[in-house]
């Protein structure tokens, strides 16, 4: 995969709430180990976070920006090499697990989803809309937007995101947002108790207007 810097990407300068960065580092250290994460952070000039991760607050505390997040994820992709896809899926899932455990109140599922009375297809849509609402509320706290919406076909939902932190300031010849793919997978499992296939089918890093994830309406198991 060929990855370069995308200059003048307005998304790159969006403010990043500290907790997002913290959860990502907590996920990556599970795969890389402490020494590996330290080396990775040093390689992108962010060694100040190697021992003391960012705050766990859903606020902009450390003046992190989206391009800081994407630098770390792209560096991890390089370190992981041929196993980058699986490792980033896994890291994204672990990050989402931390998010739901620590700040699940930001992602309140509707009552019919919690009671499991609704059909599974509707549960998936409700889950995705709950995520967008939660992320949008967090973005508003930071004084910016979270430009996302859901599209539906017979067999799939499509999660569109114009303000993706994973590929902010990045240009590539393939989709690069496997970390968020894993995050979506784990979030859906947390909401519904089921595993769903999530595949990124469009990416801002490839010149698309939005990153798009295709999500099956039907579980794997």
How should these model regions be labeled?
Residues 1-156, 165-175, 204-210, 217-221:
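N-terminal accessory segment detector
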Residues 156-158, 195:
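A residue-level signal for beta-strand positions that form part of recognition/binding surfaces
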